[in-house]
């Protein structure tokens, strides 16, 4: 089966970084997937009255913002098209509009039709964060968060953050296309952060992966006062990891997203691509 990945591109109030186009194409190319890029542009409801329209010229200002958003979407889709053409990746594109408060919801609903979701990430980009969290919790699909600060290379070394939980198991299953193509897999367990269901859970998962013909090993680390997200990323980078796979902890509460400690720690300082499953 050929996989199809979706890439959500934000245009308001912040735009997705142009680097996301190259990183997304690099990811899908490695698993032989095609790419569907969606530019989400803003549709601002007109709530002005006659006086505010006269004094502030709100209708024209709204049209200017919407026009800028559409132009941004076109520019981002063109950037993805160039990267896809150069990388030999099959691409389809789409532009959808949504009110500001619902842009994340629209992104998550569109993502449900694909196998894996890609989202660019900048720590100070509120639109990117809203889209990423909405897709993670609302799409029902694995979400790969792509850091703006790094170029995605070959994802040859996959690091699995393993605590024996349901969401971690879901993430391992969702990462199968990447695990099958990895030259090295390392299962990492943080032993001093919370009670674990056993002492050898990392090796047990690694053994199961080896039985399936994959090159997997296990390692135990300690956070030693660091956040678990920091500990996982630092160890992944130390051993040459290219992709971190982990469960996405947290829940949604009337569009306010409450992230678990590990997930929040990862996203607050993203240093490498992370596949999250909820």
Model-derived regions: residue spans:
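Structural beta-alpha unit
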Residues: 1, 42, 78-117, 212-244, ...
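Small/aliphatic-rich secondary-structure junction motif
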Residues: 1-60, 138, 154-221, 241
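Gly/Ser-rich helix-loop-strand patches that form or flank binding pockets
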Residues: 21, 26, 30, 105-151, ...
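Hydrophobic anchor at the start of a short beta-strand
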Residues: 35, 90-92, 143, 185, ...
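Short, ordered loop/turn segments at secondary-structure junctions
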Residues: 40-43, 98, 122-123, 148-150, ...
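A short acidic, glycine-rich active-site loop
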Residues: 59-75
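Short beta->alpha connector loops
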Residues: 97-101, 123-125, 165-166
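Generic hydrophobic alpha-helical scaffold/packing signal
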Residues: 176, 206, 210, 233, ...
């Amino acid at each position: 089966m050929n996989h199809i990945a979706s890439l959500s591109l934000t245009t308001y109030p912040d735009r997705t970084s142009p680097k996301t186009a190259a990183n997304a194409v690099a990811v899908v190319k490695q698993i032989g997937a095609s790419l569907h890029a969606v530019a989400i542009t803003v549709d601002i409801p007109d709530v002005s009255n006659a006086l505010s329209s006269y004094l502030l010229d709100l209708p024209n200002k709204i049209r200017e913002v919407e026009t800028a958003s559409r132009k941004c979407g076109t520019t981002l889709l063109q950037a993805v098209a160039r990267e896809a053409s150069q990388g030999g990746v099959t691409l389809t594109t789409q532009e959808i509009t949504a009110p500001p408060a619902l842009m994340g919801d629209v992104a998550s609903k569109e993502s449900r039709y694909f196998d894996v979701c890609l989202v660019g990430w900048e720590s100070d980009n509120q639109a990117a964060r809203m889209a990423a969290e909405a897709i993670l919790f609302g799409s029902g699909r694995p979400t790969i968060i792509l850091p703006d600060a790094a170029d995605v290379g070959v994802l040859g070394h996959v690091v699995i953050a393993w605590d024996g939980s349901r969401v971690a198991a879901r993430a391992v299953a969702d990462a199968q296309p990447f695990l099958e193509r990895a030259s090295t897999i390392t299962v990492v367990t943080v032993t001093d952060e919370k009670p674990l269901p056993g002492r050898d859970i990392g090796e047990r998962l690694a053994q199961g992966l080896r039985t399936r013909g994959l090159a997997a090993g296990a390692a135990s680390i300690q956070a030693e006062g660091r956040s678990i997200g920091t500990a996982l990323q630092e160890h992944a980078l130390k051993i040459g990891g290219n992709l971190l796979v982990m469960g996405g902890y947290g829940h949604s509460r009337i569009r306010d997203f409450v992230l678990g400690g590990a997930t929040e720690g990862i996203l607050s300082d993203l240093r490498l691509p992370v596949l999250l499953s909820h």
